[in-house]
Structures are given as C-alpha cells and as structure tokens.
C-alpha cells in the first residue's frame, strides 16, 4: 500500500519525548524507532476503525489503523512509558462496536507491560494535562 499519507512523528522538548501515531498500522519500524529514540514518554496512537470484514472480505483488517492490542504492542515496541488510545468513537468508519476499542485497550494493557493507569483513555470531550500525565513542572 501507499503509506506516503500516513504519518507518525516523534517530538522532543527538553527531556520529554512524545510520539504521535496517526493512521498507522503495526510494523517493525516501531522497534527501530524505540531503539533509536526510546524510551518514549507518551505515545498517542489510534485504536479504532480496524474491522472491515465482511464489507471488504479481501481485507479483514486495516493496514492503516491498529486495533487496541496492536496499539499496545506498538507502544511496547517504542518503549513507551505511557500510551493514550485515540482515533475511536468519533464516527463510524468500520464495523467494530463503536465503544469496543477503549474497553479492549484498557483490558489488554497489563498483557503488554503497562499499568492500567498508564494506558490512558479519555472520554469523548474530556481533556487532560501533559504536565499531569508526565509528572513534570
């Protein structure tokens, strides 16, 4: 597939590293990024819009969107300390139940080495503070 329109970016400010994974699938590149730039303090990654079967039977999952467990795997490969699941529940792009991604994301956190509080889901419309999340002044 043409991945030129998909993007993930690492942002660094002082000693803080953030990764914003936008419209991304799973790949070995994240181990490479983790080895080169890790540990990442906070990763933002998509967890929704991944189930396209049976409307596209030749494509049983999205190559552009991780499911919740794949998102946790990516964050683990990045050596992320914390991970925020995003890109879910806004509007229907695929066939998984619209509220399934955050439930699966939180349920799978410990399996991928994250404390439940370090796999973060915001309610629709909720916002948070990077200072609070990263414990810096």
Predicted regions: what they are:
Residues 1-7, 11:
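Single conserved hydrophobic/aromatic residue that forms the stacking wall/gate
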Residues 21:
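Generic enzyme active-site microenvironment
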Residues 132-137:
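Short, surface-exposed amphipathic charged segments that create phosphate/polyanion-binding patches used
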Residues 12-18:
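Beta-strand-turn-beta hairpins that frame and shape the catalytic cleft
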Residues 17, 25-122:
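Cap/insert and terminal regions of metallo-dependent hydrolase folds
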Residues 124-131:
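A short acidic, often aromatic-flanked loop/helix-cap motif at beta-alpha or helix-coil junctions
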């Amino acid at each position: 597939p043409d991945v030129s329109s998909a993007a993930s970016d690492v942002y660094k400010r002082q000693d803080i590293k953030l990764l914003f994974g936008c419209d991304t699938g799973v790949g070995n590149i994240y181990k490479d990024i983790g080895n080169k730039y890790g540990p990442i303090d906070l990763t933002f990654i998509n967890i929704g819009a991944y189930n396209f079967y049976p409307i596209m039977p030749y494509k049983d999952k999205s190559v552009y969107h991780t499911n919740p467990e794949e998102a946790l795997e990516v964050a683990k490969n990045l050596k992320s300390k914390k991970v925020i699941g995003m890109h879910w529940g806004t509007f229907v792009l695929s066939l998984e139940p619209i509220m399934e991604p955050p439930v699966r994301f939180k349920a799978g956190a410990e399996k991928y080495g994250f404390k439940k509080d370090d796999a973060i889901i915001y309610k629709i419309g909720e916002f948070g503070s990077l200072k609070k999340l990263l414990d810096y002044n």
